[in-house]
Amino acid sequence: MEAGNGDSSLTANAKASIPRGERLDRALARASDAPLREGNRIMLLKDGPNTYDDWIAEISRAEHWVHLENYIFRADEVGNRFAKVLCEKASEGVRVRVLYDWFGCLDTPRAFWRRLRSAGVEVRAVSPPLLGTPLGVVRRDHRKLVTIDGTYASTGGVCISEGWLVTSPETGLPYRDTAVNVRGPAVADLDRAFAGTWAEAGEPLPDEECPSAEQLPAAGEESVRIIIQEPRRMRTLRMLQLLTASVEQRLWITDAYFLSMPILTQSLMAAARDGVDVRVLVPATNDLALIGALSRTGYQQFLEAGVRIFEYGGPMIHAKTLVADGRWSKVGSTNLNLSSLYANWEIDLVAEDSGFASKMEQLFEEDLAGAREVRLVQTWRGEKARPEGPLDTEDRRARRSAVGSGTGSGAILVRVGSVALQKSGAPLNTHEQALSAAASGALLGSSLLVGRFPRLVAWPLAAVGGLLGGIGLLRAARSALSGGVTTPPAPDYPESDGQ
């Protein structure tokens, strides 16, 4: 027994001898499967126009390869700017590879992809619907990533669409988003992330386009991790849990579609109750209106715990950023909701540098200057979460008409599953009751319409039912023939032409 106590004491003393920061760094590396890379130079990119200029300038200087991966790639003014420079580089002999998400680019015509391919650009779609995996549609490639020649990379929340060029007609505030570019050893991790998704959609990249971090020279003094989120891996979620549990002074978050998972919600509220300055900045008017409404249903519990919530007054704030204790900063594609943290391919850069964190805090404070705080207000029905001032009606209408990251009603349907899973076990508050009543009314109306005009939906439902039934029988037959053991099919994504 004495020996056991001695071992325990030695272990405790050993832990005490390791500085707290080093212990947290080690925990972050294990939780996120992301080693800390030193010797990098990183630069903030604010909003779409600055980000596009940076990306296009770097692409135009490419000599060996260009890797571009984005959830949305529109065939509009911005998309055509990128298409032009990508085609030019391909014609010069540069290996140009483009990954786009099948669902996110539903609105992009096939002719756009044909134009790129005819110029020599290799184009692949990620996660198109397949008969063998009908539920694979919930897995989306939500990344925004550019890597060039092993010397430059960039990631953030910016998609390729002229929606990122919008400004508010009333306030003059821009469509806000944040990206970051990086040079140095961390570029290898971003290339590795692209290589993983590229292999999901076809043949893998050649080795020369996947340099190791050890092969890349230092370019600065900043230390960063690249968190490569893949379906069901939850690496970003584990990192967020560690940070929220360890933060001591302040935690400032910007998120576009804030439907926090219960485990993260509890962590944020616990930090606020412990005296941490927890602030969350979200859009006042979301480009996915239903998601914005559902996000507000959680305001009250956060406010009661001491979390401060702000709503940005521009057309949209699409950034996915975080800064903690003036040391840790996150910039990337991951929203704080179930689909991003569990189901999607995402990518985030986490910097451990006080200088970069200071710039992130300054950017957050600039955004707060264009935001209104949500507070608890006493009403005749008790305390309710209310913003400090109403939005101008004309401005609200203009924002809702702006093109953003949503892909129509389909985007809402895919993402609303996240809400159902998060809300299913919780009692409804007043706002949720109103939303539930509206949804129930819509469902009832749809049912009456079907009852009155059954042929409108009979054939589509029969087709869907027959398809799913056939898939089920086929998989059961395969299982029986293989002795009850099914082997997951290898990814075999067809050469996509906008499908």
Spans of model-derived segments:
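Membrane-helix interfacial anchor on the cytosolic side
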Residues: 467-487
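Charged, low-complexity intrinsically disordered terminal segments
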Residues: 2-452, 460-463, 467, 495-499
